[in-house]
């Protein structure tokens, strides 16, 4: 398997058949095919687009599903507009709701079938039931999402990154770059890189020091630096991260 999410599909009793092209997808379809599944973030980088998968599904009368767990649940939903039957989102990523919750949007008949497989019904998903507290918390998160000023939120994310950058901008050899992921975890991400010999710490050492401090600060690290994603930071977190990063980078 490639990653643990493959098992989330296999656990319902199906066999995964991986394809790369439209021809391979159509050739793999038979009377036992239960679902066509695609990872939304990677769809446009592959040879089968979301719209093409949806078209094939309708042609062969097979349900289609997009895993968009880390994406923004935008309205109107472009996956549903592309023709897929259902799309799933995490309740705990962009929505900032309970980590153990999620949303499935789409065809009412399919959603009803999913509902019948979970609590309060005694079916396959009974062990993974969401509590009533999680359901209401996710509903609140969705209501907050549609009311949120996303443009102002983005500016706040940029400000948080700037606070961190300003705190270490004078460290020898340090450089900064930013990028925005295409679909999943969409927010401005800042890469902070440096020459380990000049600073005296490798990226792995800096990441470990941040993680082992108080409070713990978790970052991604790569060969020459670390990365900061502000969209999971709470108000004031930047004022904790910035001095801690400076302390580590300037202490030998």
Regions of interest found by a model, annotated:
Residues 146-180:
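Conserved PLP-dependent catalytic core of the aminotransferase class-I/II
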Residues 167-247:
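Conserved C-terminal alpha-helix-loop-beta "cap" of PLP-dependent enzymes
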Residues 1-147, 165-169, 230, 244-247:
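Conserved PLP-enzyme active-site core in the AAT-like
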């Amino acid at each position: 398997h490639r990653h643990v999410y493959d098992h989330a599909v296999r656990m319902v009793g199906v066999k995964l058949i991986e394809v790369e092209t439209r021809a391979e997808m159509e050739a793999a379809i038979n009377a036992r095919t239960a679902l066509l599944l695609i990872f939304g973030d990677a769809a446009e980088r592959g040879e089968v687009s979301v719209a093409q998968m949806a078209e094939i599904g309708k042609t062969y009368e097979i349900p289609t599903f997009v895993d968009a767990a880390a994406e923004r649940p935008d309205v109107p939903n472009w996956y549903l507009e592309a023709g897929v039957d259902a799309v799933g989102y995490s309740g705990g990523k962009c929505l900032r709701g309970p980590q153990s919750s999620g949303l499935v949007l789409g065809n009412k008949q399919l959603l009803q079938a999913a509902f019948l497989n979970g609590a309060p019904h005694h079916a396959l998903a009974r062990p993974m039931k969401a509590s009533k507290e999680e359901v209401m918390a996710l509903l609140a998160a969705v209501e907050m999402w549609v009311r949120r000023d996303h443009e102002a939120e983005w500016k706040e994310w940029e400000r948080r990154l700037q606070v961190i950058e300003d705190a270490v901008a004078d460290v020898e050899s340090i450089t900064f770059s930013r990028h925005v992921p295409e679909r999943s975890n969409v927010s401005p991400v800042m890469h902070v890189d440096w020459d380990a010999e000049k600073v005296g710490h490798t990226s792995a050492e800096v990441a470990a020091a941040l993680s082992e401090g108080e409070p713990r600060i978790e970052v991604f690290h790569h060969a020459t630096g670390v990365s900061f994603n502000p969209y999971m930071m709470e108000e004031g977190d930047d004022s904790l991260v910035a001095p801690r990063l400076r302390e580590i980078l300037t202490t030998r």
